[in-house]
A protein has these predicted regions:
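An interfacial alpha-helical scaffold signature
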Residues: 1-236, 240-253
Length: 253
């Protein structure tokens, strides 16, 4: 079987044994994790079949089988990166995009050398920080009914115009909710990144870059918001995660 290297993340090369050596944490297909070093950086990699993530070499597996395999690989990628996040609390870790591969260790080292300054800058920026994801949703039909009840004058127009005005009023209310949530949480964060609102009921999908020391304050802020908007908004709070939303490095394979 011809192999290549799957690249998970970049961590500090401080001359010590990598955090996964004693735990024997494995990567995709339980392959041993290893590091490829360049100067003070170390890429965490594992060996995979060269046909993986290559549609031209993926064989005769059905689309359903390929999808299941991809989901399993993504889950393992996330598990490895979360492990690295927890084991690199002080030195930090830089997650790289899912599916990044290289022919061999030499090519991995070449990637580290080519974008060293970017990687070093990102790793320094993310040191001691995690990503926390905040999603807020509401019952849109209920909100529209409330708006109509509070503004009976809107019901005097024709149905098309009434519908348009109701949704415009709902958007104003959504923006106020989102602003209030952000005002409460942003003092505890170093940065934030807007995510797509994946459903009509979702009013906010935002990732925050938070120092570990301030994570308890962020948690308290979420508790406050949950109590304040109980019965009006439902929240989904995800994290801590590696700072996926705050890394934007273009690495060609």
């Amino acid at each position: 079987m011809q192999e290549k290297k799957f690249i998970y993340a970049v961590i500090e090369n401080n001359g010590e044994s990598p955090p996964f050596v004693e735990s024997r944490t494995g990567g995709i297909d339980a392959a041993p994790l290893e590091t490829v070093c360049y100067r003070d950086l170390a890429a965490v990699v594992s060996a995979i079949d060269a046909s993986r993530f290559d549609p031209d070499l993926s064989g005769e597996a059905s689309s359903a089988q390929k999808e299941e395999s991809l989901k399993a690989d993504l889950l393992k990628y996330q598990q490895v990166n979360f492990f690295l996040l927890e084991q690199s609390r002080r030195s930090g870790m830089l997650p790289l995009r899912f599916g990044l591969t290289a022919r061999d260790k030499e090519e991995v080292e070449g990637v580290l050398e080519r974008v060293y300054i970017q990687l070093r800058t990102y790793l320094d920026r993310l040191k001691g920080k995690v990503e926390l994801v905040v999603q807020a949703s509401w019952d849109l039909p209920k909100i529209l009914q409330e708006i109509a009840g509070d503004n009976p004058e809107l019901m005097g127009a024709d149905r098309v115009q009434t519908g348009r005005m109701l949704f415009e009023a709902a958007e104003v209310r959504r923006e106020k909710f989102a602003a209030a949530i952000h005002d409460k949480l942003s003092p505890f964060a170093r940065d934030f990144s807007e995510g797509p609102r994946k459903a009509e009921a979702m009013i906010l999908n935002r990732s925050y870059l938070v120092e570990r020391e301030k994570e308890p304050l962020f948690d308290e802020g979420m508790d406050f918001l949950g109590t304040k908007y109980e019965g009006h908004l439902s929240f989904r709070y995800i994290g801590p995660l590696p700072a996926y939303s705050f890394v934007n490095i273009e690495l060609t394979q």
